[in-house]
Amino acid sequence: MQERRVDVVLVGGGIMSATLGVLLKELEPSWSMMLLERLEGVALESTGAWNNAGTGHQALCELNYTPMRSNGEIDIQKAIKINESFEISKQFWAYHVQKKHLKEPESFIHPVPHMSFVRGKDVAYLQARHKALSLHPLFCGMKYSESMDEIERWVPLIAEGRKREERVAATCIDWGTDVNFGSLTEQFSDYLAKQEGFVLKTHHEVVDIKRSQEGHWRVKSLDKKSGEFTEVEARFVFIGAGGAALPLLYKSGIPEARGYGGFPVSGQWLVCSNPEPIEIHRAKVYGKAAVGAPPMSVPHLDTRVIDGEKKLLFGPFAGFSTNFLKQGSYLDFFLSFNSGNFKTMIEAGLDNIPLTQYLINQVMLSLKGRIEVLKEYMPKAEFGDWELKIAGQRVQIIKPDAKNRGSLQFGTEVVASNDGSLAALLGASPGASTAVEAMLGVLEKCFKKELETPLWKEKLQEMIPSYGHPLSDDLGRLNENRRYTSGLLHLPFTPVQ
């Protein structure tokens, strides 16, 4: 068995590991690092463009980030947090475009309007949401309309074929984006692979993580080509392996992982094959999720640019699969039960029977049934223009709540060892769009001393000018930041007045 020592091991070749790798390599160029990926390349699971449930999340159009309180008011706090997080991501990407670490921005980001669209009784909700968000500087420029004619100008495919008297409403922000996180991850990985002291190994599946006698971590991986096992010792390990993060976290044995479980959710897209509607539609149009639907299954008619080509997707339709990865095993879910999380998992399961029923119903939908759902957004959709494509796999967090009862959580969370030597990212949605802030969270949990040094402070400020300063609190800083990122990323800029 081959052995070696490095400062950092990154497990998983997705956007999270790539982002953390770049952050650490910029902050500590002399550190040795190794990235281990089980597949033949990076970004082939949830980070991939076809597998990502939503791209460019800024809470501009995703209605599940702005719930209505019991008193009828709209809670916009989560939307503010997500929007701030995306601004941080844009700064980080802009810095690396400027430094030529990334290719031209058109290789991974494009301007695409973000819209919300509702019908009937949901109009009052959207009106209240628009009123609440439009007062906040982060959401400046959000247009609202109940006019079918105006909505038709924004998105013809949504309005065509509707009765003119139908009660509808839409919001639109012109400066939304579409992000290809697969391309971004590939480019960051290529950049890292060229750096001294960085090793990227594909076809290497991590099978065990254990403490060494010195207090470091021994990471054991299987070379799926040769069948040989390799062991590497590291001072710090990050597990950014998507659905595989949870079982690997268990193997580490850290007490902080006790009680955590996972609930897998699969997805499927309807993909348009007719060039005409693809060309006509240019927006990400989000609607209201069905009661009981998980957040990554909010239906949307979605313009994306994948490998330089404009695409039109609808969905994702949720489903249930016991895999924790798209290219995983049907046994993943069952093998995730252990003595530390059994109670948590059973309690969460009993409390979420309606969700399970919803997912099973989604799985049972025929192609014709899915087209009928699409017609709620695009009334003149033609059956022959659409085909079904499998999306990525998500594993939602299950953990004890404040009453110590197992609870299904929607979102992401960093779980770290007490000494900061190991961290894992669990969960899904908003995911990739907030990768930079999530990985800054890893630094804050695991590298507290280093963050206090002038070297780290100055470098982080260089990469992310607003780091430590919320943009929503400073109109001048917000405009300065958006002007800077828009210029480098070739995005439209609208100053906040």
UniProtKB/Swiss-Prot annotation:
Top EC category: oxidoreductase
Catalytic activity: (S)-malate + a quinone = a quinol + oxaloacetate
HAMAP family for this protein: MQO
Protein name, per record: Probable malate:quinone oxidoreductase
Entry's EC annotation: 1.1.5.4
Organism superkingdom: Bacteria
Family the UniProt entry places it in: Belongs to the MQO family.
Keywords: FAD, Flavoprotein, Oxidoreductase, Tricarboxylic acid cycle
Cofactors named for this entry: FAD
Gene: mqo
Pfam families: Mqo
Pathway involvement of the protein, from the record: Carbohydrate metabolism; tricarboxylic acid cycle; oxaloacetate from (S)-malate (quinone route): step 1/1
Entry-linked InterPro entries: FAD/NAD-bd_sf, MQO
GO terms of molecular function: 2-hydroxyglutarate dehydrogenase activity; L-malate dehydrogenase (quinone) activity
